[in-house]
Regions:
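Membrane-helix and juxtamembrane interface regions of eukaryotic multi-pass membrane proteins
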Residues: 1-154
Length: 154
């Protein structure tokens, strides 16, 4: 749980914030299992129309749909129904938003998974793409462990 500090905003234990509640490991496991099941299934179902690389990219995109849809749902829910919870400028800067935290945890898991999955295919293993995934995951990690501007994150 977040600990109150003497400052305006909450500080959190990094390990607990990212891994402690099981959200990130669950997303990582779900995406991995989904990909491992879909990839051979797609190759088997469409042997003539989808070659090995086509099956990889299709399985990759199908798996990526779920965390991206979840982030869109959480963001839309927060935007339309929860922004009134932040009434002061201090709250808009320093308060923790459960919806932003959900988006950040899901996106951290997705970017981490995407980094390793991208290394398995030459089209997605370009250095700039891998750097993008690492930097996006790092930004999510920082936003989870040092809550700042969650109001603007959704």
């Amino acid at each position: 749980m977040p600990k109150k500090s003497s400052s305006v905003y909450e500080t959190v234990d990094a390990w607990e914030a990212v891994w402690g509640d099981g959200v990130v490991p669950t997303w990582l496991a779900g995406m991995t299992v989904g990909f491992v099941l879909l990839f051979p299934l797609l190759k088997m179902m469409f042997p003539k129309t989808i070659k090995k690389h086509g099956a990889f990219l299709l399985a990759f995109e199908i798996v990526a749909f779920f965390p991206l849809f979840y982030c869109a749902y959480e963001g839309a829910t927060a935007w339309w129904f929860k922004l009134d919870d932040f009434t002061t400028k201090e709250q808009r800067l320093y308060a923790t938003s459960p919806h932003a935290r959900n988006v950040l945890q899901c996106n951290f898991a997705f970017q981490t998974w995407d980094f390793f999955a991208s290394m398995l295919h030459k089209e997605t293993a370009a250095p700039e793409m891998l750097a993008h995934h690492l930097l996006a995951a790092l930004l999510c990690y920082w936003a989870i462990t040092m809550p700042y501007m969650h109001y603007y994150g959704v």
